[in-house]
Amino acid sequence: MYNGEVPTSFYAACAQLKCSRTLSLKTVRRTVFTFASSLTLEARHGRLQVLSSLNFRINKKEIYRSISLSLSKKLSESWAFCFRCGIIDLVIEMLEKNVQNRNQVEIICIEDLVPQSHLLRKIESAVDFKKIYDFVEDLYCTDNGRPSIDPVILFKMVLIQHLYGIRSLRRVADEVSLNIAYRWFLGYAINEPTPHFSTLSYNFRHRFIEGTVDKIFNWILDEIANEGYLNPEAVFIDGTHIKANANKNKKIKEQVPVAAKRYAEELLEEINADREAHGKKPFDDEQKPPKSKNQQKKNNTSKKKLKRRKKEEKMKEVTKSTTDPESGLFVKGEHKRQFAYEAHTACEKNGYVVGVEVTPGNVHDSVAFDDVYDEVVEKYPEVETIVADSAYKTPHICKKVFDDGRVLSTSYKRPMTKKGNHPWYEYVYDEFYDAVICPANQMLRYSTTNRDGYREYKSDPHICMNCPTRHLCTASKDCVKIVTKHIWHDYVELAEDIRHTPEYAELYKERKEKIERVFADAKEKHAMRYTPYRGLTAVKNWVKLKFAAMNLKKYAIHKDFDRKRREYYDIFSSAFLCLATLIMKQVKPEIQFS
């Protein structure tokens, strides 16, 4: 049995510690190992408690962690087991105790309390925030009213919120009053009162409207572009959902008009031209009723019926939230349903967000593409390639991008055909006969061009009725197979051909590293997974300010890194020049460097 005596080797190690003025974890680990290695396995049956008086300041958790590493690495498993189970209990007590003197008066400089490597220092040196005065000057009255809080301070407070992922403005106001680095960034002394959260909230709800936020967002992008950090040759576009501040159980069903497509007029013109080329009557967009009574009786269509039909065609039923009516019901799979907004975002190769458009969560990515694309192309005409996933592989988007002289790089899009039927590629289009050849080598002739822009090719029902593979082709009662082809399908085939080229295939692989990383950082580091705001305008301003903060953060880090790299380059180049001068003087004294 263990007699409870402490080995002399341990006292010698402790004495060595007392003579030293520094106490590192390596020294503690070596001391504990000296003590533990002198014990025997008989300590399993007893409980050893050692008190050591060390006049040093050190965290107990670090000591225990060090002891655990020592026992697990340098001793046998049995000793580690004894320590973990509490058979050996090592307690280190400190003689020196800190007396809490909270009323001590000191003279300090807030500049000295903020580390030189702090992110806010990098941001402060990266841009000149005085530019904000030009954006908000017309929003303030200069000759009457109470003195206002500096608008730069208000924008900096919101910038702090998005940089550090603080969810509410109330929490931002509390953090600013407590955090010394935040006070330094805003220009407040330690004992100076900071703005109330209600002031911050009121200004960003009623004064700094959407136009002001857009100016801030574009100003930061201009600063980044002027320094040469933007590379908009390839732009990556995608959308991400943001959970709305709305209860998914509080909802109503409502009939809303179907939103007209932006390219509806252009599409209708080409549809009518295609119908006329095939000898069909063009569509009349106004759908005027027949004028004569004989025509009304012949068509069995009255004026009231046409109005009712027109009304029914342009209305649809949607699920609306009673809490936030401007949000949309986002459906993903069979079970995931929630009210959300969607941020359709575009970024360039370095990860800077160059454009964003916020829509309700039930708006498809391809519908919001035009707004994002037009915004990016207007600011950066040098864009050459648009990289997007298969959701953007639609005839209109392909036509729009290729007609502008740019390239659309997309992925494979799964055909939306019935499982078990003939695959789509077995229906071959014959351009000479303007017909489709089915797997049974029968021709499907042109029938019409519908209002959605699709040419319809129909089979002969007498042939299909006796076809042995009809069950793999169609289940229609009249035995007619219909194959549709969009009038802009050639642009989709061009995008499919580009997908197989090595250059654009490698470029598409970067999509997950660029735009997906932007979304991951925004949600994990900057609290964009859930919005506390309600209403499309408020959420859009919130998203744009968040992306502006992310751009500014990335820009400040890049600029600080380049500054340090230039400093190191100057040091090494000077040292190399001096060394080369000394060497050349020894080899050829007559050669000197100026």
Feature-to-residue mapping (PLM):
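Short, positively charged and aromatic/hydrophobic N-terminal segments
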Residues: Y2, T34, R47, S70, ...
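Short hydrophobic alpha-helical segments enriched in small aliphatic residues
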Residues: G4, A12-A15, A36, G46
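Short hydrophobic targeting helices and cationic amphipathic motifs
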Residues: Y11, S20, L39, L54-R57, ...
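Cysteine-centered motifs
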Residues: C14, C19, C82-C85, C578
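Cationic, low-complexity basic patches in intrinsically disordered or flexible, solvent-exposed regions
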Residues: L17-C19, L75, Q586-P589
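Anion-binding and metal-coordination hotspots
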Residues: E96-K97, G165-L178, Y188-S594
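Basic, short loop/linker segments at the boundary and entry of helix-turn-helix/winged-helix-like folds
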Residues: Q116-L159, Y164-G165
